[in-house]
Curated annotation (Swiss-Prot):
Assembly mode: Homotetramer.
Species annotation: Pediococcus pentosaceus (strain ATCC 25745 / CCUG 21536 / LMG 10740 / 183-1w)
Keywords assigned by UniProt, alphabetized: Carbohydrate metabolism, Cytoplasm, Isomerase, Magnesium, Metal-binding, Xylose metabolism
InterPro entries: Xyl_isomerase-like_sf (IPR036237), Xylose_isom_bac (IPR013452), Xylose_isomerase (IPR001998)
Signal peptide residues on this chain, from the entry's feature table: none
Species classification: Bacteria, Bacillati, Bacillota, Bacilli, Lactobacillales
GO biological-process terms attached to the record: D-xylose metabolic process
Protein name: Xylose isomerase
Primary location group: cytoplasm
Record-level Gene Ontology MF annotations: magnesium ion binding; xylose isomerase activity
Enzymatic reactions: alpha-D-xylose = alpha-D-xylulofuranose
Superkingdom of origin: Bacteria
Active site, per annotation: H102, D105
Entry similarity comment: Belongs to the xylose isomerase family.
Cofactor(s) demanded: Mg(2+)
Length: 447
């Protein structure tokens, strides 16, 4: 493979050569076994094409600062084709097997959808060649139904039939690409599938339309023989004020309302969880409990900032708890950990792209190590079992097994004094649990 970057391939070095980040992985050792599986199998890391190849590091108040070697190509198609080479070398040097992309990440649009598809197919042809050459894989692909001005009021939920038709045609071609590249999953993120005001919105009709749209998408996938897992990615707001896939619970309710729960799982992002007022681990738990945990977009936000900043993950506490949920789920099946993340605006060099991905991979690898030890020692399991132990016998078991009515429950407690009711409760020992979690993090990672 040609050398486009003056950086060495990232390998596992542990902490023996010092603690400064950047020379290799301190915690991510791809072939090391964790609970009987290689770390690389638990952590199917993926590089996001849009942030890595296309992101200019703009913010709402300033132009982009990113300095990228492919900027030397002035012709849009020439640059698009060159980016494929840069992307695959980046994957190789980062020791990452997977990548993800939107259709519009790959190639410039033409004046018509036919022209746009032709541009896209040229780039996909090259991607397929590089995949065959390198063995790299597509974790998931998706379509951008939010960037172009035609999607001013949404794609599948647009109040304009022509735009809904265009959205369907764009998804159709994107699904055909998914089959060509053997994409393991196909993601729907409703960037503008929501509303700004109820004053001009038929909310019920829009949700019925997007449900119909999803059924049609699945029907077409079946028709062409594409078998990848369909995923929905929740987000509460931005760019719209109210998005229909607000959070995991709302999205699951939507899927069940419209009979889509057998065809879809969830792709959950850390920063989106914050915007919804939840922790990342909460969203993962909700999906896991529903049997609909599909994949993870590994990023984080700033809890002091109220918008989506897509920062590379560095919070070991959060990573540990998310990995704990993933292990409890038995892994992510066809899903993985896609870095839907970008360096900070002041981190504008190519070196920063390598360092940021290294940091994110090490953070989740460290979290996986701690989570595995927590599970092995049954730290939380034993506490939870004891906390709910009153439902194993007596009136609790009767309640659990549907053997009592409200009247019988009333008879049981009607004459119990307050002192007995208080005595039946137990301390949650939350401070002790949080401190224990800290101790596991310090101890496991200190080895």
């Amino acid at each position: 493979m040609s050398e486009y970057y003056d950086f060495n391939k990232m390998e596992y070095i542990g902490n023996q050569k010092g603690l400064k980040a950047g020379d290799g992985f301190h915690y991510y050792n791809p072939d090391e076994l964790i609970q009987g599986k290689k770390m690389s199998e638990w952590l199917k890391f993926s590089v996001a094409y849009w942030h890595t190849m296309d992101q200019r590091l703009v913010d709402p108040f300033g132009d982009g600062t990113a300095q990228r070697p492919w900027d030397k190509f002035e012709d849009p198609m020439e640059q698009a084709l060159a980016k494929v080479d840069y992307m695959f070398e980046f994957l190789d040097k980062m020791n990452v097997e997977y990548f993800a992309f939107h259709d519009r990440d790959l190639a410039p649009e033409g004046n018509t959808l036919r022209e746009t598809n032709a541009n896209l197919d040229k780039v996909v042809d090259k991607i397929v060649e590089k995949m065959q050459e390198t063995g790299k894989k597509v974790l998931w692909n998706t379509s951008s139904l939010f960037t172009n001005p035609r999607f001013v009021a949404g794609g599948a939920t647009a109040p304009f039939a022509d735009i809904v038709a265009y959205s369907a045609a764009q998804i159709k071609h994107s699904l055909e690409i998914a089959k060509r590249v053997n994409s393991m999953n196909y993601v729907f993120w409703g960037g503008r599938e929501g509303y700004e005001s109820l004053l001009n919105t038929d909310m019920k009709l829009e949700q019925e339309h997007i449900a119909k749209f999803f059924h049609m998408a699945k029907d077409y996938a079946n028709e062409i023989g594409y078998t990848g897992q369909f995923l929905l990615e929740p987000k509460p707001k931005e760019p719209t004020s109210h998005q229909y896939d607000t959070d995991a619970a709302t999205t699951i309710a939507f899927l069940k309302t419209y009979g889509l729960e057998k065809d879809f799982k969830l792709n959950l992002e850390g920063n989106h969880a914050y915007l919804a007022g939840h922790t990342y681990e909460h969203e993962v738990r909700v999906a896991r409990d529903a049997g609909l945990l599909g994949s993870l977009d590994a990023n984080m936000g700033d809890k002091l900032i109220g918008w989506d900043i897509d920062e590379f993950p560095n919070d070991i506490y959060e990573a540990t708890l998310v990995m704990y949920e993933m292990l409890k789920n038995g892994g992510l099946a066809t899903g993985g950990l896609n870095f839907d993340a970008k360096p900070r605006r002041q981190s504008f060099t190519m070196e920063d792209l390598f360092l940021a991905h290294t940091a994110g991979m090490d953070t989740y690898a460290a979290g996986l190590r701690v989570a595995a030890k927590l599970l092995e020692d049954r730290v939380f399991d034993s506490v939870i079992e004891d906390r709910y132990s009153s439902f194993k016998s007596g009136i609790g078991a009767d309640f659990e097994n549907d053997k009592v009515t409200f009247k019988e429950l009333e008879d049981y407690v009607i004459d119990k004094p307050q002192s007995e009711l208080i005595a039946a409760t137990k301390s949650g020992h939350l401070e002790q649990l949080k401190s224990t979690l800290n101790n596991y993090i310090f101890t496991v990672l200190g080895k």
